[in-house]
Amino acid sequence: MPLASSASCRSRVMNLHVIRLATIVAAFGVIVACGTSQTSETNDAPREPAGFDRQVMRVSTVDSAGGIESIDRCVWVADTSDERRRGLMGVTTLGAADGMLFVQEQPTSGAFWMKDTLIDLSIAFFNQDGEFLDAMNMSPCLATNGNDCPRYQTPSSYVFALEVAQGDLAELGIHSTSIISLVDQTCSSSTARE
């Protein structure tokens, strides 16, 4: 049996190294692709507000006979500057609450925006006595520059601002004669949305 030339051996060894390297690179590519991809289940998983307390908000209205009707609702409460700044950014569902109530320490005229907010919302503003001032609908803003997002502002100073899924204000009993107040109790099954 004739001996192969050293050049021929080197060529075969080189080919084996190239094949091994190509296999390793391909395997690494598959591992990286699989390791960094997310399933649609992960991407589509509902994200509700995190790091906020839920509390009962009482909605009272004067009926046509002059009596007061009240209903308790469950809301996420944003009462620190960090919580108010985060609000409903990145949230895809309100979860087991009817909305988020932003509580200011004193009357303010600060505007709201929808930067990085993913769901359409309605907002209602209330004064320091909880009396209804104004309401409007807001649309998500996914602009990379927050300066490109519209601002939503009421002409009056407010202390409370309630954000709910767009169109839910009437369903929750919020209208021009509504008065809201926070009740010192956490949400129960009767006040929490199922």
What are the functions of these language-model segments?
Residues 1-3, 44:
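Selective for proline/serine-rich intrinsically disordered segments
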Residues 2, 27-28:
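Residue-level signal for mature regions of secreted extracellular proteins and peptides
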Residues 2, 15, 151-153:
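Short secondary-structure transition/capping segments
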Residues 4-23:
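Bacterial N-terminal signal peptides that target proteins for export
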Residues 31-33:
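C-terminal motif of bacterial Sec signal peptides marking the signal peptidase cleavage site
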Residues 35-194:
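Compact, glycine-rich, soluble single-domain proteins
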